[in-house]
A protein has these predicted regions:
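N-terminal leader/targeting segments and the immediate start of mature chains
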Residues: 1-39, 46-51, 176-187
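Short beta-strand micro-motifs enriched in acidic
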Residues: 46-48, 109-111, 136-140
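Non-transmembrane domains of secretory- and envelope-associated proteins
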Residues: 113, 124-131, 139-187
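An acidic-aromatic
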Residues: 44-91, 151-156
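Short beta-strand segments that buttress and anchor functional surface loops
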Residues: 27-29, 53-57, 118-125, 146-150
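Residue-level detector of beta-strand structural context in well-folded domains
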Residues: 43, 52, 59, 104, ...
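Flexible, processing/modification-adjacent segments and terminal tails
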Residues: 7-24, 38, 67-131, 186
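Short, surface-exposed coil-to-beta transition loops
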Residues: 38-42, 56-57, 64-65, 128-133, ...
């Protein structure tokens, strides 16, 4: 068991890496509730700071720090919005670590193999909307391996598959084809 100062240092280093580097990974999101069987959704993600690109099934989403792009291939429609903080949290679960670090009780434990650290953030005030945020990082490089959010009876789990940091300039927007219907809902 590490002390609180060490845990906060790990979280700080992890968040600094996400701000200064570009993380790329395939992933699987698992949504489970007490009543229903778990649902799994594979996808790909690219994250740098608050910016991200996300692909899941027939949906692509991107955020460039100002505009949210949401493309649905089934309807060939691109929607542009100014997202709310809640929408950004739902699209990029690592934002929870940043948003909750100052308002949570923080605990830590080692994974079974000892190669990863599991950090649990439990809000001191349950009016925040979530019951628990769990972040699992690889010890050698603080690479995120898993994030889990518990909201009431629902658990959303994001499991990374071979995450890595990539170099070079990345595009965090979706450029529509000429035939794509663009729905600009920005204020």
């Amino acid at each position: 068991m590490k002390g609180l100062v060490v845990i906060l240092s790990i979280l700080s280093s992890f968040l600094t890496n996400l701000e200064t580097k570009t993380l790329q990974s395939d992933f699987t999101i698992t949504i489970s509730e007490e009543v229903n069987a778990p649902m799994n959704f594979p996808g790909k993600i690219l994250i740098q700071g608050d910016k991200f690109c996300l692909e899941m099934m027939d949906i692509k989403a991107a955020y460039n720090g100002k505009t949210m792009y949401m493309y649905t291939s089934q309807t060939d429609e691109l929607t542009l919005t100014n997202p709310t903080e809640q929408e950004l949290l739902e699209a990029n679960p690592f934002r929870y670590a940043k948003a909750l670090v100052d308002v949570c009780n923080i605990t830590e434990k080692a994974s079974q193999d000892g190669k990863q650290t599991i950090i649990t953030l439990t809000p001191k005030d349950q009016s925040i909307g979530i019951n628990r945020f769990v972040l699992q990082v690889r010890n050698e490089d603080l690479m995120p391996m898993k994030a889990e959010i518990k909201e009431g009876k629902k658990i959303s789990s994001l499991k990374m598959k071979e995450p890595k940091y990539v170099s070079g300039e990345q595009q965090f927007e979706i450029v529509p084809e000429k035939s794509t219907f663009v729905n600009d809902m920005r204020l």
